[in-house]
Regions:
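Catalytic phosphate/metal-binding cores of nucleic-acid and nucleotide-processing enzymes, i.e., regions
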Residues: 1-119
Length: 119
């Protein structure tokens, strides 16, 4: 099942889905290790997403980084058949959540039995 990205204000929970907030600390939500450190208001959405993709790619090189640990955790859920929804404020606009979903799906597809992470 593909990972979905939804707007935190507009998404209605479906039975059995796992919802994970992936944004910055805001409006009572804690900072996610996958929150985008680059703001669209400071250089435009495209630039923020380009910078985020590079940031996440680098973070995933160190399995001990908080971002990598969270992607691994989410990939294990997806590999196990979970219906995962990533929540952010900007969806359905282009969103860093789409980049996270791509990374999670890619890793989940490569995982072995029991959620083992490939070398």
């Amino acid at each position: 099942m593909p990972v979905r990205v939804a707007n935190i204000w507009k998404h209605h929970r479906s039975e059995g889905e796992i919802r994970v907030y992936v944004g910055r600390a805001c409006r009572g939500y804690p900072q996610s290790p996958l929150g985008n450190p680059y703001r669209a208001s400071e250089g435009g959405r495209d630039q923020a997403l380009t910078q985020y993709r590079a940031w996440l790619t680098e973070a995933l090189q160190d399995a001990r980084s908080p971002a990598a640990a969270e992607v691994i955790r989410l990939a294990r859920l997806v590999a196990g058949g979970a219906d995962l929804v990533l929540l952010c404020w900007c969806a359905p606009k282009d969103c860093h959540g789409d980049i996270v979903a791509e990374a999670v799906e890619k890793l989940a597809a490569r995982m072995g039995p029991g959620g083992t992470v490939p070398a």
